[in-house]
UniProtKB/Swiss-Prot annotation:
Residues 174-193 have a biased composition (Basic and acidic residues). This is Putative uncharacterized protein DDB_G0274435. Signal peptide: none annotated. InterPro entries: Coilin_N. It comes from the Eukaryota. Residues 144-155, 194-236, 243-255, 313-350, 378-409 have a biased composition (Low complexity). Residues 91-162, 174-255, 309-422 are annotated as: Disordered. Residues 351-360 have a biased composition (Basic residues). Residues 116-143 have a biased composition (Acidic residues). Pfam families: Coilin_N (PF15862).
């Protein structure tokens, strides 16, 4: 049976396997570093599922054993031939065994029928097979000698060489197999005690793991029991609370409700200011309009302060001293009550930006009223000469107050209008650095007026700076309250700072 095989598609399947003979062109045998003949033998045995020994031959009839050094296979012809060999029975002649290797398919089919009968004797020992092979080879030599008259001498010489090579190859294979069996038998007793030790170690490890798991389960159960006990104790303690604690809780709840109501009232009373307009509609306002709003806001504030002072002075001049005392006392009590309420609110919760502004305005107005009432009482008890002096003193005090306020405004204006371009740009912020940054950092737009705030860095948390603002720079009209911490520091991301400057302590 002749089988044509393709290396690309893989070796074709066969149903009946004996010793395989393969013809390879001698031109395809070249030296290479990777693919050896051993690799080719193993590939054929795996693909054809051949467990018995076989040999490869060239077209000239030379055997190529796998152990031969120097003959290394680079590539095989895509259409090489594989022939099935017939085993030789004992004491039988094989006249056509060597000659029929290159014959037609019909001769090979006849030989395949003979190979079926020879498979029954394949289970004999290696010694018997070697004897039979030697006898068959001797028979083949005798037959070849008898047929030498018809064939040329060159073919006889080739056959003799083939027979000699076959003998050598089979002898080498038998020796290799015997050595491999000896090595396996020598390794078996050594492997057994090692396997026993490994099994014992594995059993010990499994036992240890089981013990650890049991201990963990016990610990978990104990922890769960302790938690349940603690929960029961807490529930019992809550039910057994004394009446004093209950009263305190009720009082605290009432105070919280009152504070919430007061905050709601204050928020309702406070009118909508420029801060709300800018924060809510900052994306629709142009730069020029914002500048005008800033200037107008400062003018309005100054006018309101002057009007309040004039009204207070006119009230003191026109009203009677008795009515002034009564009104002042009532106003003082009212202001004190408001101050107490506001202080309570401040202690409980941090004030918002608007509440701070209202408290400052109320405190300033109450202080001015108290000063005028005290002066009026002193004027009533003193003589007319003292009255005139007191009036002069009051006028001087009022002038001083206005001058002080004007001086404060001028100082603030100087600070705001400081030439910050002379300072260095802030590149790497550090704790305790004194810095200046633009006032409008928390809004979505950029002002053309270069207004700055000054402060000192208290803490740096990743990319957020916590800045303590310097006194005189506490005008938070363009800052969002959410960025202020409870400590009063301003938490600002570094990336949101616009043109920050590093101020040296000498300035």
């Amino acid at each position: 049976m002749i089988i044509k095989l393709s290396i690309e598609k893989g070796l074709s399947e066969c149903t009946d396997f004996n010793k395989v003979l393969m013809f390879i062109q001698p031109l395809k045998l070249k030296l290479i570093e990777t693919k050896t003949l051993e690799y080719l033998y193993s590939l054929i045995s795996k693909k054809f599922k051949i467990k018995k020994s076989f040999l490869l031959y060239t077209e000239d009839g030379y055997a190529i054993p796998p152990s031969e050094e120097g003959s290394i296979l680079k590539e095989i012809d895509k259409t090489f031939k594989v022939l099935k060999l017939n085993k030789v029975k004992k004491n039988e002649k094989t006249d056509d065994s060597g000659d029929d290797l290159m014959e037609t398919d019909s001769d090979n089919k006849n030989k395949s029928s003979e190979s079926d009968s020879s498979e029954s004797d394949s289970s004999e020992s290696e010694s018997d097979s070697s004897e039979s092979e030697s006898e068959s080879e001797s028979n083949e030599t005798s037959e070849n000698e008898s047929s030498s008259s018809s064939e040329p001498e060159s073919s006889l010489a080739k056959k003799k060489l083939l027979i000699q090579q076959l003998k050598r190859d089979f002898q080498l294979k038998e020796k290799l197999q015997q050595e491999q069996q000896k090595q396996k038998e020598a390794q078996k007793p050594k492997e057994k005690p090692q396997q026993q030790q490994q099994q014992q170690q594995q059993q010990q490890q499994q036992q240890q793991q089981q013990q650890q798991q049991q201990q963990q389960q016990q610990q978990q159960q104990q922890q769960q029991k302790q938690k349940q006990k603690q929960q029961k104790q807490q529930i019992e303690q809550q039910h057994k609370k004394p009446p004093q604690q209950q009263q305190q809780q009720q009082q605290q709840q009432q105070q919280q409700q009152q504070q919430q109501q007061q905050q709601q009232q204050q928020q309702e009373e406070v009118p909508i200011g420029i801060d709300d307009v800018l924060t809510n509609f900052s994306y629709t306002i142009s730069y020029d309009n914002i500048d005008e709003l800033l200037v107008e806001e400062e003018k309005i504030k100054r006018k309101e302060l002057e009007q309040k002072k004039r009204k207070l002075q006119s009230q003191l001049d026109n009203d009677g001293l008795a009515n002034k005392n009564d009104n002042n006392s009532n106003n003082n009590n009212y202001n004190n009550s408001n101050n107490n309420d506001s202080n309570n609110n401040n202690t409980n919760k941090p004030l918002s930006k608007r509440q701070k502004k209202l408290l400052k305005k109320q405190q300033n107005s109450s202080q001015i009223k108290e000063n005028y009432t005290i002066n009026a009482i002193n004027n009533k008890n003193d003589n007319s000469t003292n009255d005139s002096n007191n009036n002069n003193d009051n006028n001087n005090n009022n002038k001083n107050d206005t001058n002080d306020s004007n001086n404060d405004d001028n100082n603030n204006d100087k600070k705001k209008n400081n030439n910050y371009s002379t300072f260095k740009d802030l590149t790497i912020p550090n704790v305790n650095d004194k810095i200046a940054f633009q006032k409008h950092i928390l809004l979505d737009y950029v002002l053309t007026v270069s207004e700055y705030l000054e402060g000192r860095i208290e803490k740096i948390d990743s990319d957020i700076l916590y800045i303590r603002l310097e006194p005189g720079f506490d005008d938070f009209e363009f800052l969002d309250n959410e960025f202020f911490e409870e400590s009063g520091a301003l938490g600002v991301p570094v990336k949101s700072l616009i043109s920050p400057k590093l101020i040296s302590d000498n300035n």
